[in-house]
Amino acid sequence: MEEQDARVPALEPFRVEQAPPLIYYVPDFISKEEEEYLLRQVFNAPKPKWTQLSGRKLQNWGGLPHPRGMVPERLPPWLQRYVDKVSDLSLFGGLPANHVLVNQYLPGEGIMPHEDGPLYYPTVSTISLGSHTVLDFYEPRQPDDDVPMEQPRPPQRPITSLLVEPRSLLVLRGTAYTRLLHGISATRVDELDATSLPPNATACKSALPGAHLVRGTRVSLTIRRVPRVLRASLLLSK
């Protein structure tokens, strides 16, 4: 078994059963006061730090990941504290996380199914702030020779979905990271099935059968490790 597929001893009580391996969901990883503090810091960041994308906007901290290596930038103390807290769980092969992507999603915004790619150590950890969301997991699309290219394909259905509440920590490793795609639908209300709740429902206070969960503004701190790091002088010389 490869190292990235190994279970995390510190998080075993929070492993999500009945879900692709390996997914850990930790409710109330931070306190309400910490959540409020982090939201203040995020929204007090200088305007040039924000990048507007279709369906969300983001801040990049720690450097810009690059195939030739990332030129590291010092994380601000308000972020470093939580990067250290996540790194202490030994998620990144015994090395510390060094990169944080801050995403803001307004109600009705989401992100298409995607994979995080080879620039990162194959583990992703996310602290959620402000609002819940539902994270959907998908099998990668396979070429279908029977469907003409010009014919639209039916919408892909997720193989499973997790309810992600504010102040939680979500960790994806193994198959959940390396093979599956994950995304967030662009909706304002998440309706929970009355007969089939998300596999992490027992850890979510709002996961009630038939619940209609109205999304607010959500901020996520996606904490990862970029293995390949360069000094600025080396990058500029290439």
Swiss-Prot record:
Organism: Mus musculus (Mouse)
Transmembrane segments: none
Domain of life the protein comes from: Eukaryota
Cofactor note: Binds 1 Fe(2+) ion per subunit.
EC number: 1.14.11.-
Cofactor(s) the record lists: Fe(2+)
UniProt main location, coarse: cytoplasm
Binding site for Fe cation: 114, 116, 182
GO MF entries: dioxygenase activity; metal ion binding
Name the record gives this protein: Probable RNA/DNA demethylase ALKBH6
Gene: Alkbh6
Keywords noted in UniProt: Cytoplasm, Dioxygenase, Iron, Metal-binding, Nucleus, Oxidoreductase
